[in-house]
Amino acid sequence: MTNNESERELVLQTLRTWMAFRQAVQRVLKRHNVDMTFEMLQVMNCLWNKQGISQQSLAEKTAKDKACLTNLINNLEKKNWVIRKEGPSDRRNRLIFLTPQGEELALTVKPLINDIYAQTGAEM
């Protein structure tokens, strides 16, 4: 196997692992009746760690483009999990905050995700 083939195989295996993890998370969320996509979870997880951040910052943290993130935030707002507020220094800069329902959701979802990480670590 050449060096180029090894690098390609490593990238493919990394992608397969990521896809398997993503599917495992989605199965667990569905099993526990949490109506949330993996992409929504990425955004919510960022906000559970620090809310009141800009869409630009969320885009960087989640590796999502602006259009995709806008759509995700719109959907999260429809579920009443997040709210956009004007930034204090620039009214055009919208900051994203959790609603009380979004904060409460963490009590259900975070333990599920922690269990997935624990199980994954135990299997390695």
What would you call each of these model-derived segments?
Residues 74-124:
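Charged, amphipathic alpha-helical coiled-coil/dimerization segments
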Residues 6, 10, 36-40, 101:
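N-terminal positioning helix adjacent to the helix-turn-helix/winged-helix DNA-binding module
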Residues 50-54:
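Short capping segments at the starts of secondary-structure elements
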Residues 24-36, 118-124:
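Short amphipathic alpha-helical boundary/capping segments
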Residues 55-56, 67, 74, 94:
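Residues within helix-turn-helix
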Residues 43-44:
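Short alpha-helical "packing" element that flanks the helix-turn-helix/winged-helix DNA-binding module
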Residues 59:
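The alpha-helix within a helix-turn-helix
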